[in-house]
């Protein structure tokens, strides 16, 4: 949308120019000199900034003018630099000139009027410039600040960028900017359905004026919290509130003025993806599983395009609704885990806790988290989905997992896994992060698989003998990497991940 229209009007042969500013797609300039050639250029300003000035367009005013009080020479500018010059009272002046017996005498009679009109026009232009400057200065404290705030969220028109709430001097400012405050009377907690790092997770109802009552998930901040914990808890809402995508969990709002402090999100009927898959082991077709993976990849592409790095992408942090739509959730929580946290999923590394089995080697070694490290984690999520919630690397210790990955061992394909999917996993696990596919490429690849169902029918053929010939004596076992169920017990103690 147009915000400001700038015009530069310059008399031919003069270095001095006049600038006029308008808030609409048209502008009217009065008080121009009679019988003078002018050049005009136009540019528009939107939220994205100033555009370029148009090419100069010349026009000339009539030799005869009327008194400023009754009529004036005008110029109107409209879209695409349409220029229309109108002069009122010109016809009557011409008729009077024709009726005069002495043309030279008529010109002399009109000379004072011409000079007076030109002088008055110049005064009007100066007055308009002064008024425009004063108005612009007054608006800058308000409208210019608004433009600046909008532009902070755009690197180019239409491309929104994630803003880290911890860049705010007052974190509460970020919460109020990105999350909507909900009145306590609109929320009803029904039952506890789980526990999070900061408190309980409940199912409840949200009823707001003019909106249908809906089932929601409610995260609570446990009693006795510190101000630091409150800030970290609400930061997830500040992050979530910036996102709007069908494969990213939706924030309904927050309750910061109540006790306990609450975060309200949409409710996902089937809960976390890993436990949902374990409860439905073998019940979904490959096409359905690939559809789930496609949804997760689409959500991650959206987050990556916004320059957001998740850091903790795993099946446990993906939620599933009643239509099997998968949505990425749990934003930023991994960075806040304390070293005394009892969760074995996260291991201390360089002053913080990270999920070793899902984390790229450069992020483990140097805490270098990027969209490429999220792609590595996505490859592990693919393995979790295709194995129906199997634990990555089985019962290997985190240290053994790090050693295996460092020695270029990778997870073998789950049972009945299409070869193209395991190949995509291996591409996500390339050691050189710049060589891994981007989420946009992953979405396109999965779309291609879904369009060509035949490509998903070619399964990988993995045998225990092949794995043993790779070498090594790393501990661990597996349940689904080998198709022969009768040999599983023997192979659990001797099979290894694939080396690349």
From Swiss-Prot:
Tissue spec: Widely expressed in the developing nervous system.
Organism in which the protein naturally occurs: Danio rerio
Binding site for ATP: 193-201, 219
Gene name for this UniProt entry: ephb3
Motif PDZ-binding in this chain: 498-500
Gene Ontology cellular component list: dendrite; plasma membrane; receptor complex
Annotated region (Disordered), positions in chain: 76-103
EC number(s) given by UniProt: 2.7.10.1
Family as reported in the entry's similarity comment: Belongs to the protein kinase superfamily. Tyr protein kinase family. Ephrin receptor subfamily.
Name of the protein in question: Ephrin type-B receptor 3
Intracellular or extracellular location(s): Cell membrane; Cell projection, Dendrite
One BP annotation, GO: regulation of cell-cell adhesion
Cytoplasmic side: 135-500
Active site (UniProt): 312
């Amino acid at each position: 949308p147009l915000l400001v229209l700038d015009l530069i009007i310059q008399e031919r042969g003069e270095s001095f120019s006049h600038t006029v500013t308008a808030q609409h797609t048209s502008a009217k300039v009065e008080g121009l000199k009679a019988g003078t050639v002018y050049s005009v250029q136009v540019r528009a300003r939107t939220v994205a900034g100033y555009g370029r000035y148009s090419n100069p367009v010349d026009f000339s005013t009539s030799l005869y003018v009327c008194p400023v009080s009754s009529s004036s020479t005008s110029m109107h500018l409209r879209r695409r630099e349409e220029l229309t010059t109108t002069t009122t009272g010109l016809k009557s002046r011409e008729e009077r000139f024709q009726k005069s017996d002495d043309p030279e005498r008529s010109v002399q009679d009109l000379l004072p009027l011409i000079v007076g009109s030109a002088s008055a026009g110049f005064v009007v232009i100066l007055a308009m410039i002064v008024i425009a400057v004063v108005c612009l200065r007054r608006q800058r404290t308000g409208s210019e600040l608004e433009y600046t705030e909008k532009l902070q969220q755009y690197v180019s028109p239409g491309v929104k960028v994630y803003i880290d709430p911890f860049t705010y001097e007052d974190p509460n400012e970020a919460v109020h900017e990105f999350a909507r405050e909900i009145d306590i009377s609109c929320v009803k907690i029904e039952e506890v359905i789980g526990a999070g790092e900061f408190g309980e997770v409940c199912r409840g109802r949200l009823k707001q004026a003019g909106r249908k009552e809906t089932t929601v998930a409610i995260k609570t901040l446990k009693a006795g919290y510190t101000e630091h914990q409150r800030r970290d808890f609400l930061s997830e809402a500040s992050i979530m509130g910036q996102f709007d995508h069908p494969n990213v969990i939706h924030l309904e709002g927050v309750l910061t003025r109540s006790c306990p402090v609450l975060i309200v999100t949409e409710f996902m009927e089937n809960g976390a993806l890993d436990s949902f898959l374990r409860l439905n082991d073998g019940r979904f077709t490959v096409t359905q599983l690939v559809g789930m993976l496609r949804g997760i990849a689409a959500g991650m592409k959206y987050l990556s395009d916004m320059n957001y790095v998740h850091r903790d992408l795993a099946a446990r942090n993906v939620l599933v609704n009643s239509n099997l739509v998968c949505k990425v959730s749990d934003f930023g929580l991994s960075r806040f885990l304390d070293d005394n946290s009892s969760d074995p999923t996260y291991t201390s590394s360089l002053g913080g806790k990270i999920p070793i089995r899902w984390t790229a080697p450069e992020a483990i070694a140097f805490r270098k988290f990027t969209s490429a490290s999220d792609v590595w984690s996505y490859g592990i999520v693919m393995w979790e989905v295709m194995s129906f919630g199997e634990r990555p690397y089985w019962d290997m210790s985190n240290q053994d997992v790090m050693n295996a990955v460092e020695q270029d061992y990778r997870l073998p394909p789950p049972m009945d896994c299409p070869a193209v999917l395991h190949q995509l996993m291996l591409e996500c696990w390339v050691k050189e992060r710049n060589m891994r596919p981007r989420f946009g490429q992953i979405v396109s690849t999965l779309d291609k698989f879904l369009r060509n169902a035949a490509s998903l029918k070619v399964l990988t053929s993995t045998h225990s003998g092949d794995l043993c010939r790779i070498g090594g004596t790393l501990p661990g076992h597996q349940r689904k990497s080998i198709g022969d169920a009768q040999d599983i017990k023997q192979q659990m103690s001797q099979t290894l991940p694939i080396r690349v």
